[in-house]
Amino acid sequence: LKQIGGLATFISQFLIQFFRIPLIGSLVTALIGGISGWLFWLTLRKIHPALYLMPLAFLPILFQYLYLMKDSYHYEGLIAMLFWSLALNVYSYSARRFNWTYRTLIGCLLPPGLFYTMGSVAILFALSILLFDVLQKCERWYASFIPLLLLLIVGSLCVLGGSKPDYDYVFWMKDYVEYFIELEPFYGFSWQVALLVMLLFFLSRYLDHIKAYLKALVAVALPVSYTHLTLPTKLEV
């Protein structure tokens, strides 16, 4: 627990010990993914309540499931996404309840805490709250650069101090992959699509006037198109 990302490791190892029981692993993994996707949806609907796009909230978790099909990916990555969605939901709630000073204070506390307990997913969180504030046009949204800069400083100090061997471990997904595995672009899709989905929910406000069946078509076409473009060449184990 004293190591960076130690809580994610502790939780994942605690859960994995029960996976030898039939169906437990699948059920626990599905439950974690379901909760994470639901929490992300609660944040997305604050951007715009586009119910027909709700399935997209689970797209980042879908990629996490694909990563877990590879022996080189750690279960900590899925646990980290759960806490990312939880922290993002907490922040989005506070952004509406408090003024920009308290919002920035919360934003400065959550990324380092997430970094220490869950690892490099904190950089995704810092980018997510910045994008959320921009899309919501929050009061003094530019103050959200402060948590990002703070995390960049903390992460850099960890690398310079020897706590982490490389910047990929603090600012990218290498923290959740075996050290001897080359980090493929495929591993970044989960984080990238999370930010993309936030942007799509913002843009969906311009589609409110179209018919319901066209909205449903959009909800189906977007994830299918994305997976078709990215998966075929990236699923080799």
Describe each region flagged by the PLM.
Residues 2-5, 29, 52-98, 116-122, ...:
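Membrane-interface micro-motifs in multi-pass membrane enzymes
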Residues 96-111, 142-145:
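Short hydrophobic alpha-helices at membrane interfaces in multi-pass membrane enzymes
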Residues 227-233:
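Conserved small/polar residues in nucleotide/adenosyl-binding loops
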Residues 125-144:
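Perimembrane helix-loop-helix junctions
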Residues 30-47, 85-90:
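Transmembrane-helix motifs of polytopic, lipid-linked glycan transferases
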Residues 19-34:
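Loop-to-helix entry region of an early transmembrane alpha helix in multi-pass inner-membrane enzymes
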Residues 181-220:
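Cytosolic-side transmembrane helix boundary signature
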Residues 1-18, 63-73, 155-188:
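Membrane-interfacial interhelical loops
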